Amino acid sequence: MATNITHHAGITRNERNQLRKQKGLTIWLTGLSASGKSTIAVELEHQLLQRGLHAYRLDGDNVRFGLNKDLGFSDADRNENIRRIAEVAKLFADSSSIAITSFISPFRADRDTARKLHEVPTPNDSTGLPFVEVFVDVPIEVAEKRDPKGLYKKAREGIIKEFTGISSPYEAPENPEVHVKNVDLPIQEAVKQIIDYLDSKKLLDA
C-alpha cells in the first residue's frame, strides 16, 4: 500500500443522508450458484426503488465483465474479487445508497473482511456502515438440479475446475443477519424476510 497518499474528506455522511433522505448500507447476499441470489437481488432492488430508496445492485457475473475481468477462479482470485466488491459496495453505502451485492463469496474469511471494512469509519465520520449478510440457503442437491447455466454438469464432467460446492468448498455463514431457506420459497416471501429485517433495525428510515 502506498504511504504517500492522504484521504481527502469532504461532506459528512450525515449531510449526505439528510440530502438523500436515507441511510447507506450494504446488503450482502451469499450462497451457492443457483441458490437464487441474483433473482432475489433483482426483486429486492425493485422493491426498494418502489419505496423511493436509492439502491444499486452489484452482480457476480456482471462485475466479471468489467471491474474484475482480469480475475479467474483460484482461491487468490476469489479473495481479490470479493475484496474489490467490498470496497465498491462501501463506496455506494458511504454515498447514502443501498448496495446490494450478489456473489457466491464462498469463503467465510472474505465475507468477514468485507464486514470489517464497513465497520471502519471513514474520515469525517465517527461510525462505520451497516453490513447485512443474507445467506441464501439451498442444499447442493437442489442447486445442482436447478443448474440454469449447466455449470454443475460441467463441473461434474471436469470441464470447469474449482467450482464451488463440487471441487471447491462453500463455507456457510454461521450468524447471518438474514437466513433465507430458498427451497420452494416464493420470491416475494424471500424479499419480505430481508425487508422485514431492515425495517426492524430501522435501516430504511431517513
Curated annotation (Swiss-Prot):
Which pathway does it serve?
A: Sulfur metabolism; hydrogen sulfide biosynthesis; sulfite from sulfate: step 2/3
CDD domains attached here?
Answer: APSK
* Taxonomic superkingdom: Eukaryota
- Its Gene Ontology biological processes? cysteine biosynthetic process; hydrogen sulfide biosynthetic process; methionine biosynthetic process; sulfate assimilation; sulfate assimilation, phosphoadenylyl sulfate reduction by phosphoadenylyl-sulfate reductase (thioredoxin)
Positions annotated to bind ATP: G31, L32, S33, A34, S35, G36, K37, S38
> Can you tell me which residues the record assigns to a coiled coil?
none
**Which top class of enzyme applies to this chain?**
transferase
- The EC number(s) given in the record are 2.7.1.25
Record-linked InterPro entries: APS_kinase, P-loop_NTPase
Q: Where is the active site?
A: S105 (phosphoserine intermediate)
Going by the UniProt record, its keywords in alphabetical order are: Amino-acid biosynthesis, ATP-binding, Cysteine biosynthesis, Kinase, Methionine biosynthesis, Nucleotide-binding, Phosphoprotein, Transferase
Q: Which Pfam families match?
A: APS_kinase
Q: State one molecular function term (GO).
A: ATP binding
The record lists the membrane-crossing segments as none
Its UniProt entry gives the catalysed reaction(s) as: adenosine 5'-phosphosulfate + ATP = 3'-phosphoadenylyl sulfate + ADP + H(+)
Family, per entry: Belongs to the APS kinase family.
Concerning PANTHER family, the annotation shows:
BIFUNCTIONAL 3'-PHOSPHOADENOSINE 5'-PHOSPHOSULFATE SYNTHASE, PAPS SYNTHETASE, ISOFORM D
Q: Which HAMAP family match?
A: Adenylyl_sulf_kinase (MF_00065)
Among NCBIfam families, the record links this protein to: apsK, PRK03846.1
**What does this protein's UniProt record list under function?**
Catalyzes the synthesis of activated sulfate.
Q: What's this protein's name?
A: Adenylyl-sulfate kinase
The scientific name of the source species is: Emericella nidulans (strain FGSC A4 / ATCC 38163 / CBS 112.46 / NRRL 194 / M139) (Aspergillus nidulans)
